[in-house]
A protein has these predicted regions:
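Alpha-helical transmembrane segments
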Residues: 14-18
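Domain-level detector of nuclease and nuclease-like folds
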Residues: 120-123, 131-299
Length: 299
């Protein structure tokens, strides 16, 4: 009887953990009516696995279940490779070499920039590009320490904005580290180009802002590599008086309003900075309909 109770307890624990996670296993498609949970179709398989696990441990001398046995998904702050692969699947063919870095982003072209030679002199400049649908698609810049902005946005008149880019269907109070679905995601970051005369570094510049997940925009650690992490490398280089060629591209599929990913490249004149990466526009606690930005909470 004790063994039976132990098995039933294990089964209940597994079902409680597995069912909520099932809805987080895939990204939404680009079709506006296809944003859906996978919970219903996953229950039979999950129940079978849980029952098998309970039966296996019926003769065990311990009732404890560790994390390795449960194989719980999405316990890291960055999206899993499976989650990210789902988001970028339609754009993978645009890259000859793409490798997941184990911390949320992808290495492009063996991490080698394609920006060409960088001269160790000249004035900084920055420019944006939009497509025929008005979507922010790319930002190019030549950066020096002169371009760096050290003051905060409120001090330079570039504070919070009520303007929203296409697909910006915000969701608040999400579980986990990243509590919002979206940020106003910049192509060229304020701290990098905010001191270039004539460049609009505000959060309401439609040429420089697109809908980006909070994770993709803000993650900034070596083991959690969102856009801010790579911008940090460039900020440090500029603070050391280096000259950096910099490019950021938002990559869309068809007429979708929300980009699937952001490609970031940087190269310094002395060669100490040279990277080429792809940051997927996804997040652990949401599913995204890239066609219109609709969000479904999945944890």
């Amino acid at each position: 009887m004790k063994k039976l109770k132990r098995s039933l307890s294990l089964l209940a624990a597994l079902l409680l953990l597995a069912v909520p996670l099932a809805g987080c296993s895939t990204e939404s498609t680009s079709q506006s009516n296809n944003s859906q949970s996978t919970n219903g179709s996953s229950k039979p398989a999950l129940f079978s696995k849980a029952q098998s696990f309970a039966n296996k441990h019926d003769n065990s001398t311990s009732s404890q279940v560790n994390n390795d046995q449960l194989k719980q998904a999405d316990i890291t702050p960055y999206p899993s490779q499976a989650r990210s692969d789902q988001a970028i699947e339609p754009i993978k063919g645009q890259f000859n070499s793409l490798q997941f870095n184990g911390s949320g982003a992808y290495i492009v072209n063996n991490n080698q920039s394609t920006l060409g030679d960088v001269k160790p002199y000249g004035r900084p400049w920055a420019q944006n590009h939009q497509d025929s649908q008005g979507r922010a698609t790319s930002g190019d810049a030549y950066l020096t320490k002169q371009a760096r902005q050290y003051r905060n946005r409120s001090q330079t008149g570039n504070g919070a904005s009520s303007w929203k880019p296409a697909g910006y269907q915000q969701v608040f109070n999400l579980p986990g580290q990243y509590r919002f679905a979206y940020n106003r995601g910049h192509l060229l970051g304020y701290a990098l180009v905010g001191n270039i005369n004539g460049f609009n570094a505000s959060e309401s510049n439609p040429q420089n802002i697109a809908t980006q997940t909070m994770w993709a925009n803000q993650a900034q650690k070596p083991n959690n590599t969102g856009q801010n992490y790579y911008e940090g490398i460039v900020r440090k280089a500029l603070d050391q008086n280096k000259f950096v060629r910099y490019q950021v591209k938002d990559i869309y599929v068809g007429n979708e309003q929300v980009p699937r990913a952001t490609q970031i490249q940087a190269k310094s004149s002395d060669g100490t900075v040279n990277f080429n990466v792809l940051v997927p526009n996804t997040q652990n606690n949401i599913l995204i309909n890239y066609a219109n930005g609709q969000v479904t909470q999945c944890q």
